[in-house]
From Swiss-Prot:
Coiled-coil residue windows: none
Annotated catalysed reactions: 7-aminomethyl-7-carbaguanine + guanosine(34) in tRNA = 7-aminomethyl-7-carbaguanosine(34) in tRNA + guanine
Enzyme Commission number(s) of this protein: 2.4.2.29
Active site: 92 (proton acceptor), 265 (nucleophile)
Co-factor(s): Zn(2+)
UniProt xrefs under InterPro entries: ArchSynthase1/Queuine_TRR (IPR050076), TGT (IPR004803), TGT-like_sf (IPR036511), tRNA_ribo_trans-like (IPR002616)
UniProt binding sites for Zn(2+): 303, 305, 308, 334
Name the UniProt record assigns to this protein: Queuine tRNA-ribosyltransferase
Domain of life, source organism: Bacteria
Gene3D superfamilies, sorted: Queuine tRNA-ribosyltransferase-like
């Protein structure tokens, strides 16, 4: 039911091209996954999302548990039918949101107790419960419940979070029984190399269909992200997809691909779009800027998104300045298309064995600007 096949390697880096097969179709890697927190990528229909080239979408267990509840989603026939998306889906465990957003009342080895932000009631979430919720949601991939330490955190606190994450992974693995759903484990360890190495080895020992690197992009310097990815990726099984959580800039994606990462997700492209910002040739353009008022050219002549095929910069500027919802949707679609085109271009470069040359300007030791 689940299979990951590597089809090409870069001869100069660890970059690779693969295909992750799921019950709802295949995901060609490397691949960026749009974030559909509440079973929707904000302001975008499933048909529009498919037109961006998206092959897999991430939804949020924490938020869906609070509203509408996994029971309603299950009664609808699962998350795919509920949101009208017939391609692969991934649900996170909710751990990151609980530890970063929720009003925590208790955390211990058993699980966490937090206050429902909607009605003030107390909710207990354990590894078993997190998996039960995700099985009810029915995505193709479920993520293990983990403890994501903040940045900065002491070595002692990060070590405690790692031990808890590994113990919880065992409980998640024992609870997970869903033939049409793959369980991914999550490597933690903060910015401490020995804890990252230990976590990678322990999580890999479970033999799960895929592994994620978590606890990055939580406030640490980007140099630490690069170092963590370069260290951890080679320690993970070669024949399983590797997922770097919460990364969504072109530079960080290119650097991570060079280290052998396959999957990425981030709210950044749609969040930027909703705030009137477009990603163009690696830059961020604020469409509220007056310089676009009389510019009747497309955002990007080479882009295939709806905004670039049918509308001008002047029109998008007009929509954004007047707070028209269509403008936010068009920019979100454009930004997603840019990220997905970027990973597709990387994939082709790896297959042509020119990734290290074509994407060299994106690497940490280069200050050059690259257009594509």
């Amino acid at each position: 039911m689940f299979d990951f096949q590597i089809n090409a390697h870069c001869s100069h880096t660890r970059a690779r091209v693969g295909c992750f097969r799921t019950p709802h179709g295949s995901v060609n890697t490397p691949r960026f996954m749009p974030v559909g927190t509440l079973a929707t990528v904000k302001g975008i229909t499933a048909t529009q999302l498919a037109d961006t080239g998206a092959q897999m979408v991430l939804a949020n267990t924490y938020h869906l548990h609070l509203q509408p509840g996994e029971g309603i989603v299950a009664d609808a026939g699962g998350l795919h039918r509920f949101m009208g998306w017939d391609r692969p889906l991934l649900t996170d465990s909710g751990g990151f949101q609980i530890f970063s957003l929720a009003d925590l009342n208790r955390i211990d080895d058993h699980g966490v107790v937090f206050r429902n932000p909607r009605n003030g009631s107390q909710i207990e979430l354990t590894p078993e419960r997190a998996i039960e919720i995700q099985m009810a949601l029915g995505a193709d991939v479920a993520m293990a419940f983990d403890q994501c330490p903040p940045y900065p955190a002491s070595e002692s606190d990060v070590e405690t979070a790692c031990k808890r994450t590994h113990a919880w992974l065992e409980r998640c693995s024992n609870t997970h029984q869903h033939a049409n759903q793959a369980l991914f484990g999550i490597v933690q360890g903060g910015c401490f190399p020995h804890l990252r190495e230990q976590s990678a080895q322990i999580v890999a020992s479970f033999g799960l269909p895929g592994i994620a690197i978590g606890g990055v992009s939580v406030g640490e310097p980007v140099e630490d992200i690069h170092r963590i990815v370069r260290q951890v990726s080679p320690l993970l099984p070669q024949d399983r997809p590797r997922y770097l959580m919460g990364i969504g800039t072109l530079r960080e994606i290119a650097i991570a691909v060079a280290s052998g990462i396959d999957l990425f997700d981030c709210v950044l492209p749609t969040r930027l779009g909703r705030h009137g910002t477009a990603l163009v040739a690696g830059e961020r353009w604020n469409l509220r800027n007056a310089r676009f008022r009389e510019d009747h050219t497309p955002l990007d002549q080479s882009c295939t998104c709806t905004a670039c095929r049918h509308h001008s910069r002047a029109y998008l500027h007009h929509l954004i300045r007047n707070e028209e919802l269509l403008g936010l949707t068009l920019l979100s679609l454009h930004n997603l298309t840019q990220l997905i085109r970027f990973t597709s271009a990387i994939s082709q470069a790896i297959q042509d064995d020119c990734f290290s040359e074509d994407f060299a300007p994106w690497q940490p030791d280069s200050a050059a600007h690259h257009t594509w």
